Amino acid sequence: MNENVIALDGPAGSGKSTVARQIAERIGFNYLDTGAFYRALTLYLFRLHGNSPNTESFADWVKTSEAERSLSDIRILCEFSAGKENRIFLNGEEVSLAIRTPEITREIKHIANRRIYRNFVNQELHSLAKLHKLIIDGRDIGTEVFPDAKFKFYLTASSKVRAERRFLQLQEQGIEADRDEIEKEIILRDKSDMEREIAPLYQANDAILIDTDILSKNSVISKILKILDR
């Protein structure tokens, strides 16, 4: 049983990241954003593809041996910061902001859906877990990456509630958005995550289900902390 890892899985917008960061700060663990690793990997490959003379689309190129061989040239480092976003470095360059662009968000699915790239990221995560106590959020942390984690939680909420949260978040950032369109995107993302062939989203048999529809953020945090204290 792995006592260095607390796994938080669930669909997009269920509150995993916010909850994970605050719990990590309270119990002295480090919060690890697995999505940042996939984004950094996507950024590296996207740049490599853009600088190559090939005419293949990015989606097709990442399936080639040229793209897969480039994994040996990639070094992704994570700098932890209590209660804040991880700082991510790609081959020595800080890319914490560069990995959050709409372009990378759009292309990341081509990386996350391929086993060789998931294995690369998972290996990085396991290396970190040997050195640090981590609370990790994602889609398959408790089912595939760390199935031996001592504590596993699955956070969920209705698509309507998750869309409202995202809408308010965008408003705070001064970005105009449509609630209905956001909900449609969330529903499509759920379908894609749950039906993908590799590492689909589902609740682990031994994960504790928490419905964040009916609980405030502080209530969710309190509930998880009580379970961790048992």
Curated annotation (Swiss-Prot):
Signal peptide: none
Subcellular location: Cytoplasm
Reactions that this protein is recorded to catalyse: CMP + ATP = CDP + ADP; dCMP + ATP = dCDP + ADP
Predominant localisation class: cytoplasm
Family annotation (SUPFAM superfamilies): P-loop containing nucleoside triphosphate hydrolases
GO cellular component terms, semicolon-separated: cytosol
Pfam families: Cytidylate_kin
Family: Belongs to the cytidylate kinase family. Type 1 subfamily.
Protein name: Cytidylate kinase
